[in-house]
């Protein structure tokens, strides 16, 4: 599922970093204010994030308001026309500059989320300010919500955008900010979430196209692998259980397979695993027997 938000503006009419018609705050300007509301939200949300995800918080040095001063000035957190926060990066809006929550509600009503509801959750590739995730989590408090955002600056501004207590306290929320593709895939496999529907939030993905290209390719492979493993278990699982029970007495006294390690180095060997492809390969056994 792909999702687009507001697109690039004409540079002559909308200079980079300027949200026309909105009350704006450059990330770099936060250090010139005593206590901007965005700073207050950031402090509250960072503290809650650290309570919920302590290991991640330590890795990101959260809570730490000084992090806001490191955000480039072309990352612009702004007030939309309805008063909610919106975000522009290098002149491109990731959310509506008029009604970002209403925009999220339209996305939630699409067919993808009907599928996600049936599957019990989704993986969000690209977070932005998290309006879609916030609404979905509110409507489905027992579903799994996995949020991926490789851009640390977008993630920090997500924490600064508004009070996020309900979302951050969602019982099955998982957030992966500023992680590598292999680390994200390892997490999804370990948690069993790799097979959840994948929602592509394109405005956020366009900021890091190479990262999301690699992730999409790796995720597709991991999903196919998970499906193969599932089919293998369905097909051979009962047989494996029966054989294990039947041979339980022998398992304790027989020589383990590890005993064969390096005992025939340099010799030709053929190992056939009883997976879904065994039917296609077993017919070649007579030919291989003659050749070798």
Swiss-Prot record:
Keyword Signal carried by entry: yes
Keywords: Signal
Highest rank taxon of the organism: Bacteria
Region: Disordered, residue numbers: 1-30
Stretch forming the signal peptide: 1-21
Protein name stated in the entry: Uncharacterized protein TP_0761
